[in-house]
Amino acid sequence: MFHEPMLLGFPDYQLQAKNLARLLKIEYADAELHHFPDGESKIRLPVDIPSTVVICRSLDSPNNKLIELFFTVKELRQKGCEHIILAAPYLCYMRQDKEFQPGEAVSQRWVGRLLASLFDEVITVDPHLHRVKKLDDIIKTKRVVSLSAASLIGNQIALRVADPLIIGPDEESKQWVEQIAQLHQFNYLVGDKTRMGDREVNVVLPPSDVKDRSVVLVDDMASTGNTLINTARQLKNLGVNNIYCAITHALFVGESYQELLATGVKEVWSTDSVSHPSNCISLASLLAEAIKL
C-alpha cells in the first residue's frame, strides 16, 4: 500500500482516462479485461494499490461495465483501498426514473443505490435528469458532483458558426439550450416533443423565421438519434441549409449517426463522454477541476 493516488482506466475509455490522469498529475494504470466465450469477465488490477483510486470509465453499454466495476471496487477494498472516486462522464440508466407501466423496475433508483454502495464519490457530466432534479437524491454517497458541458459546447458553437440560432428539440433540452444561449448571447427556441415509442418521436417547432439562419440543434444525448433526425428534416423542409448538431453524449446506436448526416446536417460535435467519431470536445479539464485529491 502506498499513498500517492492512482487513476485506473479501462480499455474502452483509455485515451480519456490517460488525459485525465495527466491533468491530475497522478499515476495511470490499466485495469486489464478478459471476456470469456460465455460472456463472463475477468479483471486484473495492479498489484500495488494506493489508499485513493480514481476510476475513469464512461457507462454507455452499461450492463457488463456495472458488474466489472463491482468486481473492481470490491477487489480494491479487499486490498486496503480507502477512498474510491468514480469519474463517469456518461451515467447510465438515468432515463427510467419512474414506473411508467405497472411492474417496471425504476432502474435509475437501483443503479444509483448500487453506485452509492461502491464509491465514496461519483462525478459525472450532464446526467439525464427529468422528474428527479438532483443527482444526490439518486446517488447518496459522500460526494456527488453533476457537471455541465454547456460552456464547452457553447465555445465550440461560437468557434464554428457566426450568429447561430440554437434550437432544443424538447422541454428536457431547454436547460442546456438556455445555458449555452445566455453564455454567448445566442438566440434560441425550444420545440415540443411527443414520444410514441423507443424509436418514434414527433417534434413540433414554434413558429419562427429560420430560413436564412445557421441552426445548431442542441441536446444532452443522442441514442437512436430520432429526435435530432426528425427536427433536422423539419428544418430542411423550412428551407434551412446550414444545420449543425451539438450534444454531450454521442451514444448513436446502430446506423443512427449516418441517418442524421443523411438529413443534410453539416457537422456533429460531441464531447468525449462516450467514444465516437464526432468527439471534438474534451471533458478532461472539466473533470479534473472537480476531482479533489
Residue ranges and their predicted role:
Residues 1-293:
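PRPP-associated nucleotide enzymes
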